[in-house]
């Protein structure tokens, strides 16, 4: 009788243990599924920017679409770290643009211009949402003072290159490069006639995303060491937590 009672108790304990294991596994599975669903949702809501070298304008945040509401910039350490990285990479971008421009800025203006950019950026960080900060920074980097001369240098080489290479290019590539040239000309016209029309400038740069990189021959002729995809990769996520900070 005692043995029977002990066996029943053992079976009850084993059953309870099995139920506990099932409950624990089910809880872990549900927790994992919830985390995966949250990650999937976050990725769908976030505007991901291309990380590789894709083309003129590639990496510009799409200001025509609304992101996840208005986000306030955190005042934690990673913001300061991101700003430090942004300062250095912005300086490199400006210097790269100067290297391909026939009308170079005085050397003394270089660091001062970059510091002005970042000072404005830091001032905004404590008071505005991320989308506004990104837009302000892009307006600075895409301004006439920074981008007009390099775009003139670039556009001036297209007519000859298109004529010399039309026979060897596919119809698709020729059409793409021709559209690229058209957009560069449009951008230069805005710089000459409406230099403060930042929304138009940004709209044209957005369209350039679809045209890829400029012809490698032209890039090598202007400055083989400069990456045209460095003209503006900025994302709100970079200021929030990303360890990799990049400008276009």
Swiss-Prot record:
Residues 22-46, 73-95 have a biased composition (Basic and acidic residues). Signal peptide: none annotated. One of its GO terms (molecular function) is identical protein binding. One of its GO terms (biological process) is protein transport. It is a lipid-anchor. Residues 22-108 are annotated as: Disordered. It holds the Pfam family Pex19. Residues 246-248 form a propeptide. Expressed in roots, leaves, flowers, siliques and stems. Highest expression in stems and flowers. Dimer. Interacts with PEX10 (via C-terminus). Interacts with APEM9. Contributes to morphology determination of peroxisomes, but not to import of peroxisomal matrix proteins. Required for proper post-translational import and stabilization of peroxisomal membrane proteins (PMPs). Acts as a cytosolic import receptor for PMPs and delivers them to the docking factor PEX3 at the peroxisomal membrane for subsequent insertion into the membrane. Required for transport of APEM9 to peroxisome membranes. Acts as a chaperone in stabilizing or maintaining PMPs in the lipid bilayer. This is Peroxisome biogenesis protein 19-1. It comes from Arabidopsis thaliana (Mouse-ear cress).
